[in-house]
Amino acid sequence: MAKPVREVARLVLLDANNAALLMRYDDGLADRISYWVTPGGALERGESHRAAALRELMEETGLAAEIGAELWERHFDLELPQGAVHQHERFFLARVDTVAPRVFNSSPEPIREHRWWSLSALKATRDVIYPEDFTSALATVLNGAPHGAA
């Protein structure tokens, strides 16, 4: 039987210095490590990816930003507490015109920390970041080419 598809919108949110906002998730389970991801989440019934991106940005950061170009997408299988799904994520660019604005999380998710990451800090970290190619994808975006472009 095919796994249900979980549609997700994610944001590559950049500040005025091109630092990217990532959130550290840690559910406190001993057998799982914490990891960093971009803001975003599952679409609600009838919601577009762009609308979900705006809603998730506000819920997870308290920030508002105009949603820009779609950068890339990815598909993968994921085990959630409710069961296995096939996740389809679409990533959108968004910018804020200040440097490292303060963020506020109002979502019930196990978000433990927000951090604005420079490209050099991302290249140097040993922390787990998803998607795994986020650092190289961000470098491509900052150099002006869409991720995956030849």
Label the predicted regions:
Residues 126-150:
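Charged phosphate-binding loop/patch that engages nucleotide di/tri-phosphates or the phosphate backbone
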Residues 1-21, 41-42:
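Conserved N-terminal beta-strand and adjoining loop/helix that marks the start
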Residues 29-34:
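A conserved beta-turn-beta hairpin within the catalytic core of GNAT-like acetyltransferases
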Residues 7, 16, 70, 88, ...:
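Residues that flank catalytic or metal-binding motifs in active/ligand-binding sites
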